[in-house]
Each structure stands twice: as structure tokens, then as C-alpha cells.
């Protein structure tokens, strides 16, 4: 096995890591260190923190995120199908129609269950 072919990949990885780490190291070594109470205090958008930063999130945020990922992933399956529609013929067309039908049924089910309501 010839490992000379992997040298550009290794070089690319090393340069990428160096570009990411080198500015942080240089900033830490060469930057001025003048801590004071204002710099060390927690803030939110320039204001003092109103409450604990570790507040609980509503479950609906996670539900909407999962639903977004689910229906966004559908598009990832539709792009290759649309590109190769002429080659796959009627069987490919109808199989994707069944796939989309299942997704529509799932979407209607979520809508009827109230997963998309914010009240």
C-alpha cells in the first residue's frame, strides 16, 4: 500500500488544525491580561443576568426541532430522486409517491394531535 497518496490529506488536516488553534494560542500568550470584576461578571446582551442561566426549556422546542429534522431529511431523499427520475421509470416514481404519502399522513397526524400548536 502506497502511503504517499495520503500525504496531502494529512497536510490538509494539519493546516486546518493549525489555523484553528494557532490564533487562540497566540492570543493567550501575547494578549494583555487585565481581569476585573466587570469582565468576570455574567451578563446577557449587555445586561446583568435576570435569573439562573440554567433555566428549563419547554419540550415543544425539542419537538419542533425533531419535526424539522424529519421533514428536512425528506428533501435530502427527494433531490437524488428528482435528478434520476428519467432513469428509474414508473416504479421509482410510484415508490416515492408512497414515501411522500406516508410523510403526509404523519404530518396530518402531528397536526391533529396539536404538536404544531404553541398555546
UniProtKB/Swiss-Prot annotation:
Q: Where in the cell is it found?
A: Cell inner membrane
**Main localisation:** membrane
GO molecular function annotation: NADH dehydrogenase (ubiquinone) activity; NADH:ubiquinone reductase (non-electrogenic) activity; quinone binding
A Pfam short name: Oxidored_q4
Mode of membrane association: Multi-pass membrane protein
Q: What's the domain of life for this entry? A: Bacteria
Which reaction(s) are listed as its catalytic activity? a quinone + NADH + 5 H(+)(in) = a quinol + NAD(+) + 4 H(+)(out)
A cellular component term, taken from the record's GO annotations = plasma membrane
Looking up Gene3D superfamilies in the UniProt record yields: NADH:ubiquinone/plastoquinone oxidoreductase, chain 3
Q: Which InterPro entries match?
A: NAD(P)H_OxRDtase_bac/plastid, NADH_UbQ/plastoQ_OxRdtase_su3, NDAH_ubi_oxred_su3_sf
Q: Which residues cross the membrane?
A: 7-27, 63-83, 88-108
Listed A to Z, the keywords are: Cell inner membrane, Cell membrane, Membrane, NAD, Quinone, Translocase, Transmembrane, Transmembrane helix, Transport, Ubiquinone
Enzyme Commission number(s) from the entry: 7.1.1.-
**How does this polypeptide assemble, per the annotation?**
NDH-1 is composed of 14 different subunits. Subunits NuoA, H, J, K, L, M, N constitute the membrane sector of the complex.
Q: Which family does it belong to?
A: Belongs to the complex I subunit 3 family.
Task: Relate the protein's function as given in its record.
Answer: NDH-1 shuttles electrons from NADH, via FMN and iron-sulfur (Fe-S) centers, to quinones in the respiratory chain. The immediate electron acceptor for the enzyme in this species is believed to be ubiquinone. Couples the redox reaction to proton translocation (for every two electrons transferred, four hydrogen ions are translocated across the cytoplasmic membrane), and thus conserves the redox energy in a proton gradient.
Q: Which HAMAP family match?
A: NDH1_NuoA
The protein, known as: NADH-quinone oxidoreductase subunit A
UniProt organism field: Polaromonas naphthalenivorans (strain CJ2)
Amino acid at each position: 500500500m502506497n502511503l504517499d497518496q495520503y500525504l496531502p490529506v494529512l497536510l490538509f488536516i494539519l493546516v486546518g488544525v493549525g489555523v484553528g488553534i494557532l490564533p487562540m494560542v497566540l492570543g493567550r500568550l501575547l494578549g494583555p491580561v487585565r481581569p476585573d470584576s466587570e469582565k468576570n461578571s455574567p451578563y446577557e446582551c449587555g445586561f446583568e443576568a435576570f435569573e439562573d442561566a440554567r433555566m428549563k426549556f419547554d419540550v415543544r422546542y425539542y419537538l419542533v426541532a425533531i419535526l424539522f429534522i424529519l421533514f428536512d431529511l425528506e428533501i435530502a431523499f427527494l433531490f437524488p430522486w428528482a435528478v434520476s427520475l428519467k432513469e428509474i421509470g414508473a416504479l421509482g416514481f410510484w415508490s416515492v409517491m408512497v414515501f411522500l404519502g406516508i410523510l403526509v399522513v404523519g404530518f396530518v397526524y402531528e397536526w391533529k394531535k396539536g404538536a404544531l400548536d404553541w398555546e
